Amino acid sequence: MRLQRVLITTFAALLLVGAAVSAHHSFAAEFDSNKPIQLKGTVTRVEWINPHTWIHMAVKDADGKTEEWMIEGGTPNTLLRRGLTKTSLPEGTEIVVDGYRAKNGSNRANGRDLTFPDGRRLFLGSSGTGAPRDGRDTSER
């Protein structure tokens, strides 16, 4: 009887942990695929950390006021394999990011594509469960 209780408790705990991990890695938990956004601005900082990279950028709104935005990218390993390094985006670099807004309305977005000043484009690699499948991610093909 005691063993049965321990097994049931352990199984329930594993289910809860699995749900939390799944929610963390779910695009749909944080970002809205129905709210695409294009941000033009300058890089203020890059966080080259696991599990996601973050590009911070200064973006001018319609009134000319500067807003700070945080763009979630893929893992450093994914971006390295696509040719981006932690020194590829020095502070002050002008970039364009296409992505999807945060559901909570904050100045955060999931980055889909990054366009450099010379016109080169890079898939930021931050897709995941619930992310729109638009064919730009080469792993979708």
Q: Where does each model-flagged region fall?
A:
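Bacterial N-terminal signal peptides that target proteins for export
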Residues: 1-11
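Bacterial N-terminal signal peptides
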Residues: 9-19
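Short boundary/loop segments of OB/S1/cold-shock single-stranded nucleic-acid-binding domains
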Residues: 22-37
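Conserved hydrophobic positions within beta-strands
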Residues: 41-43, 94
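Short aromatic-glycine-enriched beta-strand elements
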Residues: 49-59
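Short nucleic-acid-contacting surface segments enriched for D/E, G, S/T with interspersed K/R
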Residues: 81-97
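OB-fold/S1-family single-stranded nucleic acid-binding modules
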Residues: 102-126
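Extended, charge-rich, solvent-exposed interface segments
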Residues: 120-141
